[in-house]
A protein has these predicted regions:
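Short, small-residue alpha-helix embedded
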Residues: 156-169
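Catalytic cores of nucleophile-dependent amide-cleaving enzymes
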Residues: 88-156
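A short acidic, glycine/proline-enriched capping/turn motif at secondary-structure boundaries
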Residues: 75-78, 124-126
Length: 238
């Protein structure tokens, strides 16, 4: 067993009527797991806040690895995560508030070694103050997310690249803002900053305006910062 684990909590993306094969991020992650061979996946589904918290606690109870990374993959909108409606507008799951989700993450992170959190949800990354508050009151070193309504396939591929490089950081690298930003630079350099990853109200948003990275190095006296601009500068996307 490797020393690294990826905890994956995935909400429903589509109804069976809309996409009967029920697409999931799991096969993409399993491909990375088989390719790298140095981490293990703990996967759960959730439909509402109680299910989210139970899934997270169960995964942590079963994980024996020293280094943990959390990937939350679900619908996002404004300040809600995991909501899903049927085509006729009826709510299948109401999801949960972002503040509720982050409160749960902070609580478990104080007793589990969660190094980083990837929020694979539309628009949630725009709530930078919430990300910084989460880092301030937890040992989590970084949070990455998206600030607009992202396309599913492209964002999933970006998530895979981000996880590959972020999980490759050494423990001592987490003391350095430069090295953390460097890992995300390497992950995103595979893509074009001009790629129109978001579609909103008759306009498109390029990848360079869609990402959000908050960091708090693991060292005494460190404070959380929004390092999105530094990341864009390193990529040459600013």
């Amino acid at each position: 067993m490797g020393e690294t684990a990826l905890l994956v909590l995935e909400g429903p993306w589509w109804t069976p009527a809309h996409k009967p094969k029920r697409p999931s991020v799991l096969p993409f992650l399993e491909g990375l797991e088989k390719y790298k061979g140095n981490f293990n996946i703990y996967y759960s589904n959730f439909y509402e806040k109680q299910g989210f918290q139970r899934a997270l606690e169960d995964d942590l109870a079963n994980a024996r690895e020293d280094r943990l990374f959390l990937y939350i993959a679900a619908h996002g909108g404004s300040r809600m995560v995991g909501a899903l409606e049927a085509e006729e507008g009826k709510s299948i799951t109401g999801g949960m508030r972002l503040t509720t989700l982050l409160k749960g993450v902070r609580r478990v992170a104080r007793t589990a070694n969660i190094e980083g959190v990837l929020l694979g949800s539309c628009t949630i990354g725009s709530n930078r103050a919430d990300m910084l508050a989460t880092l301030k009151t937890s040992p989590i070193a970084w949070i990455f997310g998206y600030a607009c309504e992202i396309d599913w396939i492209p964002s999933t591929l970006i998530d895979i690249s981000v996880l590959e490089h972020a999980m490759a950081l050494k423990k001592e690298d987490l003391r350095s803002r430069t090295k953390i930003v460097g890992a995300f630079t390497s992950a995103l350099r595979r893509f074009s900053g001009e790629y129109p990853i978001c579609k909103e109200e008759n306009r498109t948003v390029p990848l360079k305006h869609a990402i959000s990275l908050s960091i708090k190095p693991r060292k005494a006296g460190a404070h959380p910062e929004d390092r999105t601009r530094a990341l864009l500068d390193e990529l040459g996307w600013s």
